[in-house]
Structure formats: structure tokens, C-alpha cells
């Protein structure tokens, strides 16, 4: 039996045993088109998906609905993905987080262009992100990461 089958089986059993609802995923990304693409993909797998375009909007949604999994971009204006993870920890939310990021090009001190996605991704991993995905990534990897995060979330409770 493949690992993903075991993961889905465990998820289905635990979900059926605890409550009669679809697992919920909050997708946080300031790129609306990307957020909608992820939401459509996960909704087709049977998830109840909500999108937030910033960490601040996500914090409100988390307080109101407490999603089962959060998928967040690292780099966003205002409250970014790392700040959101800090907020989750400070407010004692035990929600598995999947962190996503693309290459981010910054202008250095002397005008040089540098790619800085690794520092944010390393910080997210050290803060307990259950999965770290680099854009672009495939649908199967996203679906598997969410299934694993849900299984991880079940063991937390």
C-alpha cells in the first residue's frame, strides 16, 4: 500500500470518528491568482478552502474558523508567513503549517540583485513548518503535503 493511501485512510478514519465535516485549509498568499489556483486544486480533493491575501486577514480567519491546515507564502507585505507562524505560536494555535515560496529578488546594499528565499524557508522550517514547498511545485506534491499535514494535525489533538 502506498504512503499516500495510508495517509488518506488515517485521515478519513480520524475525521469520520471526530466530526462530520470536510477538512478545512486556509491558503494565505498576496498573489490572488495563485491563491485561487491552490484553492481550486484542494477543493477538487474535497477540502473546504478559504483564501486570505495577507497575514492579518489570515489571523482573523484563524480566530473565527480554526482551519485544520494553513498553507502560507513566506514573503508578503505586512504580516508575512514567518510573522503568521509567530502569531500562531504566541496565541497557542496548534495548526500544521505548510510554507510556500518562490524566488524573491532583492536589491542589495550596492544595487546588486540577490535571490533570497532560503533564509525565509530555513526560518519557517526551524519554526516547525510541517512542509516547505518551493514554487513552482506540482499538484501531487501539494496534495500529498496537505494530506500529511492533516495526519500530523490529528496526532496533535
Label each residue range with its predicted role:
Residues 1-24, 140-157:
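Non-catalytic signal-transmission and effector/linker regions of two-component phosphorelay proteins
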Residues 36-40, 44:
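Charged docking surfaces used in two-component/phosphorelay signaling
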Amino acid at each position: 500500500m502506498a504512503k499516500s493511501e495510508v495517509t488518506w485512510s488515517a485521515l478519513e478514519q480520524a475525521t469520520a470518528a471526530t466530526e462530520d465535516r470536510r477538512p478545512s485549509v486556509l491558503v494565505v498568499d498576496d498573489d490572488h491568482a495563485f491563491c485561487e489556483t491552490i484553492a481550486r486544486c484542494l477543493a477538487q480533493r474535497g477540502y473546504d478552502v478559504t483564501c486570505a491575501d495577507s497575514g492579518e486577514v489570515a489571523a482573523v480567519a484563524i480566530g473565527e474558523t480554526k482551519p485544520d491546515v494553513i498553507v502560507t507564502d513566506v514573503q508578503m507585505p505586512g504580516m508575512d508567513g514567518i510573522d503568521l507562524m509567530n502569531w500562531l505560536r504566541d496565541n497557542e494555535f496548534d495548526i500544521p503549517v505548510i510554507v510556500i515560496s518562490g524566488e524573491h529578488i532583492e536589491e542589495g546594499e550596492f544595487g546588486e540583485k540577490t535571490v533570497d528565499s532560503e533564509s525565509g524557508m530555513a526560518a519557517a522550517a526551524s519554526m516547525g513548518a510541517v512542509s516547505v514547498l518551493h514554487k513552482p511545485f506540482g499538484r501531487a506534491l501539494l496534495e500529498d503535503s496537505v494530506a500529511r499535514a492533516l495526519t500530523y494535525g490529528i496526532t496533535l489533538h
